[in-house]
Amino acid sequence: MSEDQAVSFEDRLVRVTEGEFEGWYVWQSDAFEQRAGPFYERFDADGRGIAAFRADLRHMNGGGFMHGGCLMTFADSAIFTFARHALGKSHAVTMNLSGDFLDSARVGELIEARGEVTRAGGKTIFVRGVATADGRPVLSFTAIIKKIGPRV
């Protein structure tokens, strides 16, 4: 996206108005996440970020289980939901993301991630989370995010 095409942060996050994820939000400007997910997000009553998507056949590997790369891509998206308040108006990138696969996920399951910021200071934010498939833990992950400048 060129600077002429840039839109504000608030314009990129769109509220879903129908379907299973009605009331959630999705990034309309992230073509990769749309293809990989799409991934949805919202905040609970306590202000904690939640990310989710419905497992589809295209998310599965040759063995019929969710591809590990899909889960890690989802985790990489979710960490920014968890860090939203710590990020403020800053743009950021993932410096490190590591995960431990705990179980497999299958077609039709609701994949949901919940997490928290464990430390935020200066330009670095540390995050951890767990992704579940229909409530069953499938991935635990930790990440380091680096702020790189204000959002357009």
Report each predicted region and the residues it spans:
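Terminal targeting signals and extreme-terminal segments of soluble enzymes
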Residues: 1-152
